[in-house]
A protein has these predicted regions:
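Substrate-binding groove of N-acetylhexosamine-processing glycoside hydrolases
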Residues: 2-20, 27, 38-402
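Surface-exposed loop and adjacent secondary-structure segments within mature catalytic domains
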Residues: 32-33
Length: 402
């Protein structure tokens, strides 16, 4: 892997003017397992990590490049940080609204260079969490200034296929620009009014208020939960439980042991859906919020595209969330939560199957609209992964079984 990474550095470094090169190094979940153990018996995880990073830094040094490294693994253990070269710029990322300031202090106390790295909080969402993004960027900037960080990197990324459209990240980038330049306590509402005017030409200042409500008020079945439900199956059509995904979901739920490994995928999906039944039951209220917010934004846009936002993109993403809200409700019915959900028709299962089939078709048609938006600004990349999620759920709906 070192030889491969070094070849990538040799190929990519000449393409950029910058003398700084980010070697990554974050979230090394499999370190100390498999081949890394076989190749270095007796080495600790700290030593395995530090040795690999030092080798990459040596490759960069031969080209006169300055290494940058995501700081999360080094911060897990002070010994790891001690083993790393002193000339690395640490990229200290924290993406939650409530940050852990001590992580910034730890790097500063070692005299190391660091950038603070907040996020626009768009991953695994049809619309970003704008409220959380504002708090995250503001608090990271304030803490970075306090402990002498040399700069800030605002991150925008996606999980599970990157369903989030980068054009919707413009407000988050504006938050980052404001806070990197001058992190003063500005009310979030005031900042949103400024962005409404500056980025979207809305002199009333209210467009961002409607956009910011979408993620908080309009989501009953979020993209990440949908993908977790889907990926609980090991392979396609096997009915077997993916124990790695099951363990990840349990860790995400505070370590609660939710799944019986002996009962397979369908039982695990049922348990996960029923655990989230209160959220899934909010579908009707969420859909009303989506329609209200979308109508308000479209009225301001008045048929034009501003700041990368256009009415068609807006409705494609809103309709995607509305369809996934309906999907969550139908999956809850299949999980046995129909009484709580109130969607099972008194005429029986045949009409339920008809309703599910219509939703399956609506999801497939929606994806074609989404595909047009995706390809209007980029190449195929991860689009096939999103297609797999949509088409797999369409199959489940038509089959009528988890």
């Amino acid at each position: 892997s070192h030889d491969f990474a070094s070849r990538l550095i040799e190929e990519y470094a000449p393409l950029f003017r910058s003398r700084s090169f980010n070697i990554g190094g974050d979230e090394t979940f499999d370190l100390g397992r498999g081949r890394s153990v076989q190749d270095s018996p007796g080495a600790s995880r700290d030593e395995l990590y530090a040795d690999f990073v030092k080798d990459l830094c040596s490759t960069l040094a031969h080209r006169g490049l300055q290494p940058m490294l995501w700081a999360d693994i080094a911060l897990e253990n002070p010994h790891t940080m001690d083993l790393l070269p002193g000339d690395i710029t640490m990229l200290n990322w924290m993406y939650e609204p409530d940050i852990d300031e001590s992580k910034i202090q730890t790097i500063a106390s070692q005299g190391r260079r660091q950038f603070v790295c907040p996020a626009v909080r768009a991953w695994s969402r049809f619309f970003p969490d704008y409220d959380g993004a504002w708090l995250n960027t503001y608090r990271m900037a304030v803490a970075g200034l306090k402990y002498g960080a040399e700069g800030m990197v605002v991150t925008d990324w996606g999980d599970y296929g990157h369903v989030n459209d980068p054009r919707l990240s413009v407000p988050g980038l504006c938050y980052g620009a404001q806070n990197a330049w001058n992190p003063v306590a500005i009310d979030a509402c005031e900042m949103n009014h400024r962005i409404s005017n500056l980025a979207y030409g809305d002199e009333s200042g209210w467009l961002m208020d409607s956009l910011a409500r979408i993620d908080s008020d309009g989501v009953s079945f979020p993209w990440d939960l949908a993908v977790q439900v889907l990926e609980l199956e090991y392979g396609s059509g096997t009915g077997m439980l993916n124990t790695d995904v099951a363990s990840y979901v349990e860790r995400s739920c505070g370590g609660e042991l939710m799944f019986d490994r002996a009962l397979g995928c369908a039982d695990a999906r049922r348990r996960l859906l029923l655990r989230n039944h209160a959220r899934l039951e909010r579908r009707r209220d969420c859909d009303r919020a989506l329609i209200d917010c979308g109508s308000a934004v479209v009225a301001v846009l008045d048929g034009s595209a501003r700041g990368g936002l256009n009415p068609e993109l807006l409705w494609v993403m809103l309709d995607g969330q509305r369809l996934f809200n309906r999907l969550g409700e139908e999956l809850l019915v299949l999980a046995g939560g129909e009484d709580a959900c109130g969607t099972k028709d008194v005429t029986g299962r045949a009409l339920d199957a008809s309703r599910r089939a219509r939703l399956a078709a609506d999801l497939e048609l929606w994806f074609e609209r989404y595909r047009v938006q995706w390809l209007s600004i980029g190449r195929y990349a991860e689009l096939a992964r999103i297609a797999h999620v949509v088409w797999s759920f369409a199959d489940i709906l038509r089959r009528g079984a988890l």
